């Protein structure tokens, strides 16, 4: 081997030993005739000292520059008093260099790798192989590796089998657009890249494998956000003969074990909350429990007011009026309130009413708001008591369709929590349960809230009689307002699966065409089964404190789903297209 140690392995116990390092020159400094090189490898940094007494190695050190690849042999010694570096794992020692061999030179990188600099993301992605040399980036990928090792070990110890499922499969309606792959051997037909291994893992349960997992690549052709990529990694889990409580306990144990092993953090039992309670109190099905702000329903106090902005929604069963108290918010300037009004407009809110509570004991005179004149004092007092308002607070109101109010005030709650630094702890894991089975579309049709294979908490007859009121056996794990993973007990009887398909508007012919293999499998003794899938990229992002999942993926795509380093996607030559039976047609130019 070319090296005896990694840089990060050097410590006081090696004092006096001769070692060999291989790595990159992270930083070079010339101090009073002595040359210091900080050498970097994947494990960390080590300081190597070259003095003029060893003329050959000193001359070599004098020639090297940042990012040269070098091999260095020398002796470990303690640093002089006052020269230790607590920011380096090897900061108590240094290496007195004897030999230096340049293994490869380097041009000057397009951005500095040894200091923080505000480099545009596109430049970083164009030179990702250099960006990943930066210690903070390398540390994120090292932590990701430790995480997957911990997860695999936990699942292996709990009897799970690691089974690979196909990447080339067929398109199924799972919500997002599929990435399609044309078949050369079946003209006019296309494979689809999997959005998840959902159906294959269910078929593995039918096959009797009982406990399955996979660190799976998944693909979705959707609009990208900070937590989305066209290809992403999923911790995919499925089990037989376990109910919701069992699966949630098993996977919660995995996450608690992961945080203990990787970050040395102990979590207690995760609280459970129904979907209905989460939406009512927090305006979100993935609430951030670090934030103490809550939404409070107040429509009952506004039904009779002479103010249609409130009385209209208060008397409409499809609408909601909610209040959000912000402690100490009465000092907010008008511009800040206007900014928050614009913010909720993103979510469809037509405005943002508010009351500043200056002095409650003074009655209406102690309240500052354009709306107080429209609300009887008795009702105002009930509202302020209900939200717990005291002097110095501000209370915001949302009145509109229930979905708009929940989303707008839920998003405002999160923004206020961060803007005003209200978060009460660093980590807040939880479970959300009892989701609706379906969501109703504007045209009266239904869509599956999770996916069409989720089991309901009722019989097929009850489901078809009242689909809007049906609850599912689904569960989501949420951490700090981010959905870590979602799962459910699956449908394991053909009759129930067909009933769900019918409610989703999938007729028998389409059922047979797209899901015939699944319906066939359910006829042959499919066991009760369920599972869960975690977004690995999102989990790594949270555990490293990264701002985007692009920071924790080795070679991510941009927000326009492109790879600026390899220039993918790229143009394909005409011969390859002919072999795939594809002809490109130019889009006519607009007149």
Swiss-Prot record:
<feature type="binding site">
    <location>
        <position position="220"/>
    </location>
    <ligand>
        <name>L-aspartate</name>
    </ligand>
</feature>
<feature type="binding site">
    <location>
        <position position="229"/>
    </location>
    <ligand>
        <name>ATP</name>
    </ligand>
</feature>
<dbReference type="GO" id="GO:0003676">
    <property type="term" value="F:nucleic acid binding"/>
</dbReference>
<dbReference type="GO" id="GO:0006422">
    <property type="term" value="P:aspartyl-tRNA aminoacylation"/>
</dbReference>
<dbReference type="InterPro" id="IPR004115">
    <property type="entry name" value="GAD-like_sf"/>
</dbReference>
<feature type="binding site">
    <location>
        <position position="450"/>
    </location>
    <ligand>
        <name>L-aspartate</name>
    </ligand>
</feature>
<keyword id="KW-0436">Ligase</keyword>
<feature type="binding site">
    <location>
        <position position="483"/>
    </location>
    <ligand>
        <name>ATP</name>
    </ligand>
</feature>
<dbReference type="GO" id="GO:0050560">
    <property type="term" value="F:aspartate-tRNA(Asn) ligase activity"/>
</dbReference>
<keyword id="KW-0648">Protein biosynthesis</keyword>
<feature type="binding site">
    <location>
        <position position="174"/>
    </location>
    <ligand>
        <name>L-aspartate</name>
    </ligand>
</feature>
<feature type="binding site">
    <location>
        <begin position="535"/>
        <end position="538"/>
    </location>
    <ligand>
        <name>ATP</name>
    </ligand>
</feature>
<feature type="region of interest" description="Aspartate">
    <location>
        <begin position="198"/>
        <end position="201"/>
    </location>
</feature>
<comment type="similarity">
    <text>Belongs to the class-II aminoacyl-tRNA synthetase family. Type 1 subfamily.</text>
</comment>
<keyword id="KW-0547">Nucleotide-binding</keyword>
<protein>
    <recommendedName>
        <fullName>Aspartate--tRNA(Asp/Asn) ligase</fullName>
        <ecNumber>6.1.1.23</ecNumber>
    </recommendedName>
</protein>
<keyword id="KW-0067">ATP-binding</keyword>
<feature type="binding site">
    <location>
        <position position="490"/>
    </location>
    <ligand>
        <name>L-aspartate</name>
    </ligand>
</feature>
<comment type="function">
    <text>Aspartyl-tRNA synthetase with relaxed tRNA specificity since it is able to aspartylate not only its cognate tRNA(Asp) but also tRNA(Asn). Reaction proceeds in two steps: L-aspartate is first activated by ATP to form Asp-AMP and then transferred to the acceptor end of tRNA(Asp/Asn).</text>
</comment>
<dbReference type="InterPro" id="IPR047090">
    <property type="entry name" value="AspRS_core"/>
</dbReference>
<dbReference type="InterPro" id="IPR012340">
    <property type="entry name" value="NA-bd_OB-fold"/>
</dbReference>
<feature type="binding site">
    <location>
        <begin position="220"/>
        <end position="222"/>
    </location>
    <ligand>
        <name>ATP</name>
    </ligand>
</feature>
<keyword id="KW-0030">Aminoacyl-tRNA synthetase</keyword>
<comment type="subunit">
    <text>Homodimer.</text>
</comment>
<feature type="site" description="Important for tRNA non-discrimination">
    <location>
        <position position="31"/>
    </location>
</feature>
<dbReference type="InterPro" id="IPR006195">
    <property type="entry name" value="aa-tRNA-synth_II"/>
</dbReference>
<dbReference type="InterPro" id="IPR002312">
    <property type="entry name" value="Asp/Asn-tRNA-synth_IIb"/>
</dbReference>
<dbReference type="GO" id="GO:0005737">
    <property type="term" value="C:cytoplasm"/>
</dbReference>
<dbReference type="InterPro" id="IPR004364">
    <property type="entry name" value="Aa-tRNA-synt_II"/>
</dbReference>
<dbReference type="InterPro" id="IPR029351">
    <property type="entry name" value="GAD_dom"/>
</dbReference>
<dbReference type="InterPro" id="IPR004524">
    <property type="entry name" value="Asp-tRNA-ligase_1"/>
</dbReference>
<dbReference type="InterPro" id="IPR047089">
    <property type="entry name" value="Asp-tRNA-ligase_1_N"/>
</dbReference>
<dbReference type="Pfam" id="PF02938">
    <property type="entry name" value="GAD"/>
</dbReference>
<dbReference type="InterPro" id="IPR045864">
    <property type="entry name" value="aa-tRNA-synth_II/BPL/LPL"/>
</dbReference>
<keyword id="KW-0963">Cytoplasm</keyword>
<dbReference type="GO" id="GO:0005524">
    <property type="term" value="F:ATP binding"/>
</dbReference>
<dbReference type="InterPro" id="IPR004365">
    <property type="entry name" value="NA-bd_OB_tRNA"/>
</dbReference>
<feature type="site" description="Important for tRNA non-discrimination">
    <location>
        <position position="82"/>
    </location>
</feature>
<dbReference type="GO" id="GO:0004815">
    <property type="term" value="F:aspartate-tRNA ligase activity"/>
</dbReference>
<dbReference type="Pfam" id="PF01336">
    <property type="entry name" value="tRNA_anti-codon"/>
</dbReference>
<dbReference type="Pfam" id="PF00152">
    <property type="entry name" value="tRNA-synt_2"/>
</dbReference>
């Amino acid at each position: 081997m070319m090296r005896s140690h990694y840089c990060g392995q050097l410590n006081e116990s090696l004092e006096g030993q001769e070692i060999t390092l291989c790595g990159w020159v992270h930083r070079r400094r010339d101090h009073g005739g002595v040359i210091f090189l900080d050498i970097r490898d994947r494990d960390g940094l080590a300081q190597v000292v070259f003095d003029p007494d060893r003329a050959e190695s000193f001359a070599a050190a004098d020639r090297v520059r940042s990012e040269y690849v070098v091999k260095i042999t020398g002796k470990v010694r303690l640093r002089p008093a006052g020269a230790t570096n607590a920011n380096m794992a090897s900061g108590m020692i240094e290496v007195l260099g004897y030999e230096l061999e340049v293994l490869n030179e380097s041009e000057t990188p397009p951005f500095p790798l040894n200091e923080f600099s505000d480099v545009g993301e596109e430049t970083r992605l164009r030179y990702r192989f250099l960006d990943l040399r930066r210690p903070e980036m390398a540390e994120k990928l090292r932590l990701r590796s430790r995480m997957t090792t911990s997860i695999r070990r936990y699942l292996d110890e709990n009897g799970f089998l690691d089974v690979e499922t196909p990447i080339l499969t067929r398109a199924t309606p799972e919500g997002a657009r599929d990435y399609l792959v044309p078949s050369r051997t079946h003209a006019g037909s296309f494979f689809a890249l999997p959005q998840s291994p959902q159906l294959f893992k269910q078929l593995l349960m039918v096959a009797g494998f009982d406990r399955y997992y996979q660190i799976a690549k998944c693909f979705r052709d959707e609009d990208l956000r900070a937590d989305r990529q066209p290809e992403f990694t999923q911790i995919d889990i499925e089990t037989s003969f376990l109910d919701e409580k069992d699966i949630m306990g098993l996977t919660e144990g995995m996450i608690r074990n992961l945080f203990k092993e990787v970050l040395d953090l102990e979590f207690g039992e995760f609280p459970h909350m129904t979907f209905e309670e989460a939406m009512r109190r927090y305006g979100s099905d993935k609430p951030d429990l670090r934030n103490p702000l809550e939404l409070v329903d107040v429509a009952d106090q506004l039904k009779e007011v002479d103010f249609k902005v409130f009385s209209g929604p208060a008397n409409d069963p499809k609408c909601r009026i909610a209040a959000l108290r912000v402690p100490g918010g009465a000092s907010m300037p008008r511009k800040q309130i206007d900014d928050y009004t614009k913010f909720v407009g993103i979510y469809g809110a037509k405005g943002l009413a508010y009351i500043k509570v200056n002095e409650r004991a003074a009655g209406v005179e102690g309240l500052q708001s354009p709306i107080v004149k429209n609300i009887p004092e008795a009702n105002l007092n009930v509202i302020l008591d209900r939200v717990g308002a005291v002097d110095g607070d501000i209370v915001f109101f949302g009145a509109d369709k229930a979905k708009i109010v929940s989303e707008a005030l839920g998003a405002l709650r999160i923004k206020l929590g961060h803007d005003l630094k209200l978060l009460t702890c660093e980590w807040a894991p939880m479970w959300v349960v009892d989701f609706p089975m379906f969501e109703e579309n504007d045209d009266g049709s239904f869509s599956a809230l999770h996916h069409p294979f989720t089991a309901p908490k009722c019989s097929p007859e009850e489901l078809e009689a009242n689909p809007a009121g049906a609850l599912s056996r689904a569960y989501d794990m949420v951490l700090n307002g981010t959905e870590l993973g979602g799962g459910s007990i699956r449908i394991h009887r053909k009759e129930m699966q067909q009933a769900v398909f019918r409610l989703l508007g999938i007729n028998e012919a389409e059922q047979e065409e797209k899901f015939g293999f699944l319906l066939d499998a359910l006829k042959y003794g499919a066991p009760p089964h369920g599972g869960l899938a975690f977004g690995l990229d999102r989990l790594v992002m949270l555990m490293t404190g990264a701002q985007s999942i692009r920071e924790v993926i080795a070679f991510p795509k941009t927000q326009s789903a492109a790879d600026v380093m390899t220039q993918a996607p790229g143009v394909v030559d005409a011969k390859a297209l002919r072999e795939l039976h594809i002809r490109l047609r130019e889009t006519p130019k607009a007149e």
